[in-house]
């Protein structure tokens, strides 16, 4: 019988708790949302002696987060929930501790880490882990994937625009959180007396004059003209007319300079990122963490674009390292702006880059204009490799145990520790048979989710031997031990 407080499962909405029953309609809380459903569509959760313990009161949101992360693993993408991301990363606790330690010493030692590996080695996953740890530790992150058609390092204005558009903020002590660059402008306005005298900020004709102009206007998200003016400061260079005309009408008469976008502009946009880092620190954040993936795109560039892209890489890498005296002044086509020598006054922001292995990454002593301008020291490079067999097996068992406790009664077969051990051992065996260079980690984490996925997709009962047989056959295919059409 279904009464208030009963834990139930719905075929479409998943696991929930009955809040009230009125006739044939039950109000059920599914993962934090109350829905009215037909009572006959609900199945009470039956707990066997071997079943994993049900979630404690208040854990519904955790179950929901795991379900979303489980689906992400099955799709081969990175889970979005930071806590789940650490938990579902093989060696996640150790990796997060290492990242946290780097960030803690960033202001003195600088942080520039290049995650290298071939396709499927986990570069993007590690960068997502960096973002999760950085936000947890009070850093504001700016992340993007380089793209020759959108965020092109040969056109630093597009990279700057993408990074500012990808800002993510940690939660404040009072529970508030800025959502984007527009909210950051509100924070700056509220703390203008702190921001206006910052040394790099004062030397930036774009930030100093642009923000002074915005102070003459009301900060309103529903004012499209004002939003356009703010977007100019966020890298929408064509909105210069919006901020100039609005501020002029508001009483601000100082000429606001354009943000250049042609020729070599790397120095200008690197400086704007330094200013942004300075502002964030003044507002109480730990600073700015840049996270850039797909950096290998520049290999296909023409000569001039290649040089400009790597000049930009060179400058932001210097900003993330402790200063060096043996480097020449960076190239710039806009020296008349008279910027301070910020590239040798750091470290400033932190920098994390995902880079696919290539010939230009093997020689760390190459000259300016090569990919290795990002690398100042061999310790900057983290070569990603698949985990060892024992670590993979332990992770599979832990993942299956979490699935048994959080994915509902259909996967209660996995509550049996013996079955979980058999499945994990089966996966380890085939993982071990695969050459290290061919172990695409995303495939081997996806196959671990195959067992609960099979149970959740079937209406009838599946016994343990049948499930292990299905897992074994699928793992053989992933390991390349058989072709899909082989018997």
Please report, for each region that a protein language model flagged, where it lies by residue.
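C-terminal alpha-helical "lid" subdomain
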Residues: 227-244, 367-487
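Conserved catalytic segments around the Walker B and adjacent sensor/switch elements
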Residues: 133-152, 380
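A short, basic N-terminal segment
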Residues: 15, 19-20, 25-29, 37-38, ...
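Conserved P-loop NTPase mechanochemical-coupling segment
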Residues: 192-270
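Walker A/P-loop nucleotide-binding motif
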Residues: 108-129
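The catalytic "switch" region of P-loop NTPases
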Residues: 60-66, 242-420
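Short coil-to-beta transition motif at edge beta-strands of beta-rich domains
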Residues: 1-11
């Amino acid at each position: 019988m279904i009464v208030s407080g009963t834990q139930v499962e719905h075929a479409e909405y998943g696991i929930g708790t009955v809040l009230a029953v009125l006739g044939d309609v039950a109000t059920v809380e599914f993962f934090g949302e109350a829905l009215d459903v037909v009572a006959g569509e609900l199945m009470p959760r039956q707990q066997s002696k071997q079943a994993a313990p049900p979630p404690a009161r208040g854990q519904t949101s955790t179950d929901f987060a795991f379900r979303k992360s489980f689906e992400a693993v099955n799709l081969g993408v990175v889970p979005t929930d930071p806590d789940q991301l650490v938990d579902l990363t093989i060696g996640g606790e150790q990796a997060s501790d290492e990242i946290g330690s780097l960030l803690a010493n960033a202001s003195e030692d600088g942080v520039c880490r290049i995650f290298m590996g071939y396709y499927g080695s986990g570069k993007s996953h590690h960068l997502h882990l960096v973002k999760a740890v950085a936000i947890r530790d009070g850093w504001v992150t700016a992340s993007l994937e380089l793209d020759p058609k959108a965020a092109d390092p040969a056109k630093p204005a597009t990279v700057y625009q993408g990074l500012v558009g990808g800002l993510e903020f940690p939660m404040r002590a009072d529970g508030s959180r800025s959502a984007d660059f527009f909210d950051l402008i509100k924070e700056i306005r509220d703390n203008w007396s702190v921001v206006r005298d910052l040394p790099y900020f004062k030397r930036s004709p774009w930030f100093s004059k642009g923000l002074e102009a915005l102070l003459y206007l009301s900060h309103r998200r529903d004012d499209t003209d004002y939003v356009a003016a703010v977007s100019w400061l966020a890298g929408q260079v064509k909105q210069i007319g919006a901020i100039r005309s609005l501020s002029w009408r508001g009483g601000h008469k100082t000429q606001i300079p354009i943000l250049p976008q042609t020729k070599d502009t790397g120095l200008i946009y690197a400086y704007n990122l330094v200013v942004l880092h300075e502002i964030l620190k003044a507002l109480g954040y730990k600073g700015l963490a840049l996270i850039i993936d797909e950096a290998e795109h520049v290999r296909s560039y023409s000569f001039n674009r290649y040089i400009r892209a790597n000049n930009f890489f060179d400058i932001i890498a210097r900003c993330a390292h402790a200063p060096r005296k043996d480097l020449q002044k960076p190239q710039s086509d806009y020296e008349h702006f008279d910027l301070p020598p910020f590239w040798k006054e750091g470290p400033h922001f932190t920098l994390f880059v995902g880079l696919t292995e290539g010939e230009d990454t093997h020689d760390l002593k190459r000259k300016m204009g090569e990919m290795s301008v990002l690398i100042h020291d061999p310790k900057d490079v983290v070569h990603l490799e698949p985990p060892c067999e024992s670590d993979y097996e332990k992770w599979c068992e832990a993942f299956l145990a979490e699935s048994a406790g959080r994915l509902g009664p259909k996967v209660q077969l996995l509550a049996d520790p013996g079955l979980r051990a058999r499945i994990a051992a089966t996966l380890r065996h085939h993982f071990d048979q695969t050459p290290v260079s061919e172990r695409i980690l995303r495939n081997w984490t996806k196959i671990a989710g195959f067992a609960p996925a099979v149970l959740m997709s079937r209406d009838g009962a599946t016994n343990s031997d049948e499930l292990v047989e299905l897992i074994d056959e699928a793992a053989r295919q992933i390991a390349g031990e058989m072709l899909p059409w082989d018997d």
